[in-house]
Amino acid sequence: MKSSDMMLDVTSAAGLTGQTFIAATLHLPDGMDERPAQLIFAIHGGGYSRIYWHPPFADDSYSFARWFTDQGKAVLAIDMLGMGESSRPEPESSLSGAIIAAAHAEALRQVVAQWGGPVDVTGLGHSMGGMMIIAQAASHPAMDRVAVLGWANEPMILGDTDVASLQAGLIPSGYIATPRAPMRRLFYGDDVPLALIEADEAHASTTPVTMGRDALTPGIVHQAAASIAVPVLVVQSVIDTSPAPEKEPGYFSASPAVELQIVEAAAHCQNFAGTRVKHWTQLNDWIDRTS
């Protein structure tokens, strides 16, 4: 796998004061020197960064990017605006979900444009990234299919905490840490080694309050989900955010094909589960079936 880090200037798309950059890593299969046929555009969740898809603190068996490049697919992983190494606009209150989605869409556009030809794009978002991939697909329809992992349009289950408690802990504006201790039971199954959990938590990112507030707002992307007109895959683990996974596909009423996959023996962070390869295989098969 060949990996290239980049800082993508999305100033014009974001429309904020000062320059605005999205940090990204492009993972390509070994030996790929030309335009890829298939690209996965991957957005991490709240409190995370793009290393979720290729964690430097774990062996390669935990690398989503490594596994998918071995299948011949390119992976573009970004840090969401305001998170990881991407710009942290000030005041944070100048951000909105629409601005963040526009910045992400521009980052994807720039990378695809460099190849000078058509590329089949799968947009994929995990958790809060699922919310953002829905928003992006609705407002900037440049993806051929959308995979929503661990995001619930139903009222969310949040481990040992709840929506009301997290809402009460939000500050008016700024960048905040995700309370990880109450999330452990939601994020990790019993088979995930403690050392891996602690390393994952040590690499956490802060999150813009704007995104945290949106993610805790019931129905925040219901209208956007209903407007997506490409194939959609909904993925929930047996321990995850939706109280009724079977109801999740119904929110994507304009999609020509909606599929639900349940990841067995896994919690919310599927990439750390012992069943992760089965999950990746099912996801890869769906991409190929809908290409």
Regions found by a protein language model. Name each.
Residues 33-76:
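Short, surface-exposed "cap/lid" segments of acyl-processing enzymes
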Residues 266-277:
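Catalytic histidine-centered segment of alpha/beta-hydrolase-like enzymes
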Residues 51, 79-95, 268-269:
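Glycine-rich "HGGG/HGxG" loop immediately N-terminal to the catalytic nucleophile
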Residues 1-33:
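N-terminal cap/lid segment of alpha/beta-hydrolase-fold proteins
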Residues 157-244:
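Alpha/beta-hydrolase
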